[in-house]
């Protein structure tokens, strides 16, 4: 056999071995699992890398907040997005719309009803309950009222009674099923009577979410794909009636339509919502470990104002 034929034969053997190896690698369980995970990540509105906001000024404002911050903006008109950091953070009151969505999903499936009633006992009443603190212990409250009190008045008694009504495990199963990868419902002090070891373990957890998951939830509500068009519109309507605008809406026009949810609990200050401006957009801002609460609130106000003015083609005032 000539040298040329031997070289050609070697090349053919190398190609054959390479092809077999390539096929075996791409059919291996590990490779298939990795590929599916990548496809899953790409199909969701999830970003696991930090990116810079397009405006240096915004980055400077965020850097001066005195807190760990996550910011996510998404235009509902153009689809443009930008964000600064993204990861799981303490949810505080931002867990409320997830609980509401889980409830409405169960209602849609026929498993629960907004017309059912819950008996609110004296031991169930909590301090931060501007609505339900006025009722007589032992009163029967319709689930619809609990939902509205939770969303409109940030009523903690309403929140925890709804968690009892729906079920802690059921809510977390719903969050997992819907792809809210960073969101989990904690259950501090849910059990006020005798605690089992499992209950005690649950009581040591807190709720978490991320700007990614909040943007996904708000996008679905806006598009009517979260639960149903009718029930999504109902929940968004409650978010529009929420009067606490001290975070996202403090520096925005008072008549501006805003469907939002916010929370200010200790060192955690979070806000997220849909802003119906010249360009409709979603903005979610989450902060943690705020050393100076007033400064952090001011930072959230500034971020919201800067973005609003930018998308409305107004001059952004820079100190």
Mark where each language-model region is.
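Conserved catalytic neighborhood of penicillin-recognizing serine enzymes
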Residues: 125-162, 168
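Solvent-exposed coil/turn segments that connect beta secondary-structure elements
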Residues: 76-78, 86-87, 105-106, 123-125, ...
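Structured C-terminal helix/loop/strand segments within mature extracytoplasmic catalytic/sensor domains
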Residues: 2-61, 65, 165, 216-246, ...
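Short, conserved catalytic-motif segment at the N-terminal edge
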Residues: 66-88
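Mid-domain, small-residue-enriched loop/turn segments at the edges of structured enzyme/sensor domains
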Residues: 159-218
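Active-site SXXK
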Residues: 79, 89-120, 283
């Amino acid at each position: 056999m000539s040298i040329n034929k031997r070289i050609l034969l070697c090349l053919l053997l190398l190609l054959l071995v390479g092809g077999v190896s390539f096929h075996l690698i791409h059919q291996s369980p590990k490779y298939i699992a990795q590929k599916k995970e990548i496809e899953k990540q790409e199909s969701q509105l999830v970003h696991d890398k930090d990116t810079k906001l397009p405006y240096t000024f915004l980055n400077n404002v965020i850097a001066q907040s005195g807190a760990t911050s996550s910011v996510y903006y998404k235009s509902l008109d153009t689809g443009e997005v930008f964000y600064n950091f993204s990861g799981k953070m303490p949810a505080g009151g931002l867990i409320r719309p997830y609980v509401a969505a889980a409830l409405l999903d169960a209602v849609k499936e026929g498993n629960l009803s907004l017309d059912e009633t819950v008996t609110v006992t004296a031991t169930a009443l909590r301090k931060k309950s501007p609505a339900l603190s006025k009722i007589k212990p032992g009163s029967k409250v319709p689930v619809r009222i609990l939902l509205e009190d939770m969303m409109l008045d940030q009523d903690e008694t309403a929140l925890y009674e709804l968690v009892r009504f729906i079920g802690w495990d059921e809510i977390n199963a719903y969050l997992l099923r819907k792809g809210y990868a960073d969101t989990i419902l904690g259950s501090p002090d849910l059990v006020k009577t005798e605690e089992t070891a499992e209950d005690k373990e649950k009581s040591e957890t807190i709720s978490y979410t991320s700007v990614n998951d909040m943007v996904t939830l708000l996008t679905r509500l806006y598009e009517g794909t979260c639960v149903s068009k009718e029930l999504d519109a109902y929940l968004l309507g409650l978010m529009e009636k929420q009067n606490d605008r001290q975070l996202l809406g403090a520096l925005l026009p008072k008549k501006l339509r805003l469907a939002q949810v916010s929370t200010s609990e200790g060192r955690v200050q979070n806000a997220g919502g849909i802003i119906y401006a010249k360009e409709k957009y979603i903005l979610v801002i989450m902060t943690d470990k705020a050393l100076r609460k007033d400064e952090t609130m001011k930072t959230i106000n500034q971020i919201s104002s800067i973005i609003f003015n930018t998308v409305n083609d107004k001059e952004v005032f820079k100190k």
